[in-house]
């Protein structure tokens, strides 16, 4: 799923190709750099209180400020630090999957980041008002990638990051409902807590307060991650 652009116009330019052609050639790598830079963008979640937990047992807690990746970590990003990671052609900007908790932690650490706690992830997804989904309380399959997308010509498969940006969280984080479950640094006894739901499950798993427990060294094609960074 990945490809690298190769530029073969050097000899033509040396022979006196017009200025227009030279401009077009030089613009291509610039545009690709800007697109790649986009996927490293982070959004700030300010310090303060928010409603945490499932309805009926939710509570108000306070967290310090932090930044979180706007998008799930992509195949291309992950492969820069894990040379053994292979993926299909065309998948550069799909969320990485089939990664363990340790691999996710190592990737974040290489960027001077870390995995979010369950509470940090949930605040980044729902804001302060306790909403059920990043965009509000009513489910809308157009705003996320879940198995409800299997009809009307949309297949229930993993999608490129940022495919449903109209469903972004109050802080601008994308794909917080569906696409792939995401590792957190939180544990429930010996199990790691995953958040966000995936293309494989339905609307209930995609709720901001839903979670899934997993063995830390388990890998699945519907589990990925994103990183956070402390705001100093």
Residue ranges and their predicted role:
Residues 20-27:
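Signal peptide processing junction and immediate N-terminal pro/mature segment
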Residues 1-7:
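Bacterial N-terminal signal peptides that target proteins for export
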Residues 221-232:
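Short, structured beta-strand segments at or near domain termini in extracellular proteins/domains
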Residues 66, 131, 225:
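Small-molecule pocket liners
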Residues 29-32, 55-58, 210-216:
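Short, P/G- and charge-enriched loop/turn segments at secondary-structure junctions
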Residues 36-87, 98-102, 178:
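A short glycine-rich, aromatic-capped structural motif
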Residues 9-16:
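Bacterial N-terminal signal peptides
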Residues 51, 87-221:
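Functional-site microenvironments in short loops/helix caps that host divalent-cation chemistry
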